[in-house]
Regions:
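Partner-binding and oligomerization surfaces adjacent to conserved cores of proteins
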Residues: 1-225
Length: 225
């Protein structure tokens, strides 16, 4: 069983991902939420010390890849899709397969996690820390994958995960404000995938603040030279 998740990116990096069939894994330094990975009340110094020991150990060996369950969120396009000038990659990933690191839905809540003391810092808590965020982030509808940093990084110090059975590219959605020339480059990058990957354009509804998938470029593309 699989489910569809979405990765927003600029057109430049998206085209590179399509051509090289891979996505970049993020380290803790790349994350944009200072509470990420330790959403815990650490008023007690003993709790703080124990939690830090757990989380620092995790991030010596793991990296993260973030997706959304939705492709049509206007804010996600603005924040991660280069202000609607980028693209969105749709992947099918395994659901509930213990052999993978997928299907980790983020939990959103109003308050920090609470524990009685350092004796409660264990594997189960570490798992909750990895997937708990403040409710203000709930618009992202985030799904996380955790990968190992066992392979050496590339020359720029970056780690990657290859497209494959557990990261199956199924669709590419071109942003509503993507320039026609860039759109053509995206289409060319998709061609080697054949019928396995569907290309869409994000269209703007005329009667609501909503995006829709279209199988053709928006009409305004024809007026741009």
């Amino acid at each position: 069983m699989r489910k569809r998740v979405y990765k927003f990116t600029s057109a430049q990096y998206g085209i590179s991902n399509l051509e090289k069939k891979r996505l970049k894994l993020s380290t803790i330094e790349d994350l944009n939420d200072p509470f990420d990975l330790c959403p815990l009340d650490t008023t007690d110094p003993a709790v703080s010390k124990a939690a830090n020991a757990v989380t620092s150990g995790v991030w010596k060996t793991k990296a993260i890849l973030c997706f959304s369950r939705n492709w049509d969120n206007l804010l996600l396009w603005s924040h991660y899709g280069d202000s609607h000038k980028g693209i969105c990659l749709g992947f099918d990933i395994p659901v509930g397969d213990p052999g993978t690191n997928f299907d980790t839905d983020v939990i959103y809540q109003p308050n920090l996690l609470q524990i009685r003391g350092p004796e409660d810092v264990n594997f189960d808590l570490a798992n909750r820390l990895l997937r708990t965020k403040h409710e203000s982030w709930s618009y992202e509808q985030e799904v996380r994958m955790f990968g190992l940093l066992s392979d050496p990084p590339d020359a720029k110090g970056l780690n990657w995960i290859e497209f494959g059975p557990d990261l199956l590219l199924r669709e590419v959605i071109i942003g509503a404000q993507c320039h026609p020339t860039v759109s053509k480059d995206v289409v060319e990058a998709i061609k080697p995938y054949g019928d396995a990957v569907k290309c869409w354009w994000a269209g703007m509804r005329t009667d609501a603040f909503l995006l829709v998938k279209q199988d053709h470029p928006p009409h305004w593309h024809a007026t741009v030279r």
